[in-house]
């Protein structure tokens, strides 16, 4: 067994020392994110909560019976400059915000050029907008970055402090690598910026806030920033970075945090040396205590060398959920398999034996660019106590599904049921949606699955001209997005937005709160759908 090995470094940003803000007791063990304690219908972080389960529990008005009556409630064109293929991040929805002379449920849209917009969630009226000023001593680069991989953009979905916090703030990690603390009422910075990444343009992913510590991961070595797990303690003002640097960590929802405070993420392909902590193509678990990150456990597939050679990263944010008295995780990646892991022992004594390594569900073509699983997953429990796993997938399926809704050559959403199989578990194929071009991570609410077919052209290698497609070429080849509502038990399409949305989106996703669905697209337009 590995045991608990410490692979971390801790530092205080220089500007904090200059402000005399150093000091304060070290934080104790970080544990127990709120177990779905919210009573208002909000969406405060990527995938809705710290567990990254994509399940909106506070929903009652939209049902499978009336979802066909969904309508566009409003759309608003915002002034927001795109960077590469990036426009808006996943929207955040916050209730009871006093702003612009009233009290509102606010929809927060963070744009690629470090702009943040707060809108009235009921009408689409802009309440405030801000463009966060550059704070790094490294000057900003001209242009939009290196292709579609390393873009000079705000890339991490922000996070809002929980509903029971004494003072609620919005936290945004801008492209200069600095964490911003934003007053929800005005959009003004409430505290000085805190450096979280060593250099600008590090390509971080969804921020997770648990017990006053903000976590993120970075992917693909962009901007010269090491791929690592980052923890910024809002109490002690200390930054901790996991060591050694890893392969790319690029599940779009960032790290997931379990009930005991353990932080989980998946790593992409790269050099592998378990003895030194270099764990490419693996699922990893870290603890955070006394401003120290400690590697707790990991799972590495037995075919990880082949996966690395074929560029089949484990690249999805895992989802955490309770099952039969245990806390489990489900992860996936480009290969098209799913991994179900016990949080107490991800890969068993040999770190290679999870509860389940599924058969190949997709990507029969061993395609590193458009097939398999990308982004993040969702999971929920139906009234009959069945545990469901939902996943976006690309390309044709590799296993038969008992319920289908026509050919799906581009993929879509697949649903699986988790069942006991002796002392193990199994995933049973349940349904596959109709064909969707680049399905984004789904959200489940009140028996309805909401999903965006993003329309993005995801090809990477230009087989005709050589090299990689540029961001501009991928944008040109992308198609308009579509919003779908599906019956969560059968996958039947209950609603489609048809041709109402003229633009596409890239790794943005949607939010569901207050029985409304929110998202933004590449052309600068943000939308709300719901029942009138």
Language model region names:
Residues 60-85, 98-105, 114-152, 160-201, ...:
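Extracytoplasmic/lumenal domain signature
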Residues 38-73, 92, 414:
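Blade/loop signatures of beta-propeller domains
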Residues 16-28:
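Bacterial N-terminal signal peptides
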Residues 1-19:
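Bacterial N-terminal signal peptides that target proteins for export
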Residues 89-95, 107-109:
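General structural concept
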Residues 36-39, 532:
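Low-complexity, Pro/Thr/Ser/Gly/Ala-rich linker/spacer regions in secreted
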Residues 27-37:
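Signal peptide processing junction and immediate N-terminal pro/mature segment
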